[in-house]
């Protein structure tokens, strides 16, 4: 059954407020919240220095991540799923919940959701899962309920390997994934505070309402803000590799709600869970979580633990603190019941195998492959961050480049250039992978020095070589490395002859002058002298041999 999108149709939010519609703007009257009361409560100051026998606390952290699937249309209707359009342009009776309309599941959403479940190594990918209605009243939810999966999510019992920051012990830790389920997004509210005698209000944009999401719920396996940021970054990396989502935090296509509680070290029972929302970068996520851990720990140490309540708090970037938004609903408050207008989602093993066959190599496998090449951990992390960079590096290796040389130049000088270049990416820069392979091989084989490499690389990067490759440029400019011992010895003799005072000081015990002579030899050769050979000859000459 097809449903034509009705441009400009906006449904009243079935909530405690009544929106008034003006064109495509939906104006929602401001409702009373705990934000004013909460903002008046400053976070408690840190307790005095800990006593020797004071109880130590640890944080217990789990994350609910909402990932927008980058399908062309919404989850259950044909409205376009695009970011940044005119407010309420992409709405229709289906996504606004008008009576008599029926949702139809987007097949592209299912395929990408299953790919993500496989990527998360879910041991359970249900061949039959069901949809439910999650009911709550808020102006951003025009239907008064959200189609989700509750009793039977499509994916469960997964895991994600996360590179843990050195400050938290380093290494790779496996973070459990409780479940992954398909649901639809809510609309977006933009709040405007009161001014003078004018009351505050909110504008509702329902373009986002009905956009397809996968919600990924982690186990409470994280302990610090840095770990939370590392988990979020790894999950974003995965969804980008799979082309499930662009994972753009600032645009809301990936949103992380972090559940934080603290407990005495060694205790099994969890503390009171507080949800922290509205963090639009991983750095902000780390700071928000660390603040919330400190807030809860301080309250408990000061005998005010009963002030920690199950609630939703927002991160206030300007004040660098979490602020209470509202009491956190429980499962009973959502009144889940089976979605009557959607049949179960059913697929067979052949469908799952087909999705798996189309999946690319994932970050964890690439890390293992690069580690086997002997690449250092920091270079591996830089390379794996960008799928396009991985493809370029692999093409460079396939063209014959020594792996370590290629990784060094890519993650160093080339990435520095791309960071500062305007409208240039690894995929569009003029330096072809085969030319980088030739460049790296020439340095590895001693045909040119690293210094000469740095001199010619900028021309290769910006394409000012007339299409000539590295070897042709070196030959044209006479930059080949000097590896003839006799020629280098003559250069060294000339340098020593021109600097008798420094030579006398060196032989008198001023060893630091060695660098002076190395620089002079390098300059005299135009940067072409073989570094190892010239150093060997120089040391013999300095010793008077």
From Swiss-Prot:
InterPro entries: Asn/Gln-tRNA_amidoTrfase_suB/E, Asn/Gln-tRNA_Trfase_suB/E_cat, Asn/Gln_amidotransferase, Asn/Gln_tRNA_amidoTrase-B-like, GatB, GatB_Yqey_C_2, Gln-tRNA_amidoTrfase_suB_CS, Gln_synth/guanido_kin_cat_dom
Keywords annotated in UniProt: ATP-binding, Chloroplast, Ligase, Mitochondrion, Nucleotide-binding, Plastid, Protein biosynthesis
NCBIfam families: gatB (TIGR00133), PRK05477.1-2 (NF004012), PRK05477.1-4 (NF004014)
Miscellaneous section: This protein may be expected to contain an N-terminal transit peptide but none has been predicted.
GO molecular function: ATP binding; glutaminyl-tRNA synthase (glutamine-hydrolyzing) activity
GO cellular component terms attached to this protein's record: chloroplast; glutamyl-tRNA(Gln) amidotransferase complex; mitochondrion
PANTHER family per record: GLUTAMYL-TRNA GLN AMIDOTRANSFERASE SUBUNIT B MITOCHONDRIAL AND PROKARYOTIC PET112-RELATED, GLUTAMYL-TRNA(GLN) AMIDOTRANSFERASE SUBUNIT B, MITOCHONDRIAL
HAMAP family: GatB (MF_00121)
UniProt xrefs under SMART domains: GatB_Yqey
Assembly: Subunit of the heterotrimeric GatCAB amidotransferase (AdT) complex, composed of A, B and C subunits.
Transmembrane domains' residue ranges: none
Gene name in the database record: GATB-1
Chain's role: Allows the formation of correctly charged Gln-tRNA(Gln) through the transamidation of misacylated Glu-tRNA(Gln) in chloroplasts and mitochondria. The reaction takes place in the presence of glutamine and ATP through an activated gamma-phospho-Glu-tRNA(Gln).
GO biological process: glutaminyl-tRNAGln biosynthesis via transamidation; mitochondrial translation
Pfam families xref list: GatB_N, GatB_Yqey
Name of the protein this chain belongs to: Glutamyl-tRNA(Gln) amidotransferase subunit B-1, chloroplastic/mitochondrial
EC identifiers of the protein: 6.3.5.-
Cellular compartment(s): Mitochondrion; Plastid, Chloroplast
Catalytic activity field: L-glutamyl-tRNA(Gln) + L-glutamine + ATP + H2O = L-glutaminyl-tRNA(Gln) + L-glutamate + ADP + phosphate + H(+)
Family recorded in the similarity comment: Belongs to the GatB/GatE family. GatB subfamily.
Chief localization: mitochondrion
Lineage: Eukaryota, Viridiplantae, Chlorophyta, Mamiellophyceae, Mamiellales
